[in-house]
């Protein structure tokens, strides 16, 4: 794979915008690492690394893991994860301007600055309809939807036949609160990347295949 086919990007989008669909597409297309911050945290804690132990101590006390720990975890992935040599898709980070600034500084020091920040944009009303019908197969992470993508057999996973669950935070009121928090938190980040010139917005209310084509177009890789 040529270096022109590597990718270094941030994927931004509210719950239900389809990041879980598009991130694996990006990962496969560019042979890049999908760095979801929640997964990285869990992995570092499970491995008992210095960063993981520091993070666990803070989380056990109900605190938020510091920006420095998060940026160092990403740096650790870039250094030690072979999948990062063709680039990375950052998902769930940065969430604040100080995080974005620290991330930028670290990536520039590593000689791997961000190339794109893609924002998946969807109206809140559509997100509520999408998410409140969402069904998850816990063991695999496969997701279905009561209306848009129902399983072949009601409430059962197509592959294993095991029961599907609806996440407790997928009810409408909880979701509206999450979306309000998301917008308050994310708008400054979007402005930050607009100023640095790497932001691109994609209408994620379209069918997944159209969204995918649009993402490739925005990346200049179609």
UniProtKB/Swiss-Prot annotation:
Post-translational modification N-acetylserine, affected residues: 2-3
Propeptide residues per the UniProt entry: 2
Cellular location(s): Cytoplasm, Cytosol; Mitochondrion intermembrane space
SUPFAM superfamilies given in the database record: P-loop containing nucleoside triphosphate hydrolases
CDD domains recorded: ADK
Coiled coil stretches, renumbered: none
Keywords: Acetylation, ATP-binding, Cytoplasm, Kinase, Mitochondrion, Nucleotide-binding, Transferase
Name by which UniProt lists this protein: Adenylate kinase
Organism in which the protein naturally occurs: Saccharomyces cerevisiae (strain ATCC 204508 / S288c)
Classification lineage: Eukaryota, Fungi, Dikarya, Ascomycota, Saccharomycotina
């Amino acid at each position: 794979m040529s270096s022109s086919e590597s990718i270094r990007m941030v994927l931004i989008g509210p719950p239900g915008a389809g990041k879980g669909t598009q991130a694996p597409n990006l990962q496969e297309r560019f042979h890049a690492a999908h760095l979801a911050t929640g997964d990285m945290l869990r992995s570092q804690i499970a491995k008992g690394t210095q960063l993981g132990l520091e993070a666990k101590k803070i989380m056990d006390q109900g605190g938020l893991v510091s920006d420095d720990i998060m940026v160092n975890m990403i740096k650790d992935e870039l250094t030690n994860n072979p999948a990062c040599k063709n680039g990375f898709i950052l998902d769930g980070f940065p969430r604040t301007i100080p995080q974005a600034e620290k991330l930028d500084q670290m990536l520039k020091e590593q000689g791997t600055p961000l190339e794109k920040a893609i924002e998946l944009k969807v109206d809140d009303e559509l997100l509520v309809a999408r998410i409140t019908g969402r069904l998850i197969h816990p063991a695999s992470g496969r997701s279905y939807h009561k209306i848009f993508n129902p399983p072949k057999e009601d409430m059962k996973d197509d592959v294993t036949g095991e029961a599907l669950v609806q996440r407790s935070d997928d009810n409408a009121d909880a979701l509206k609160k999450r979306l309000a928090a998301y917008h308050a938190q994310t708008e400054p980040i979007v402005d930050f990347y607009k100023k640095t010139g790497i932001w691109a917005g994609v209408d994620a209310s379209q069918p997944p295949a159209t969204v995918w084509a649009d993402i490739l177009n925005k990346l200049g890789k179609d």
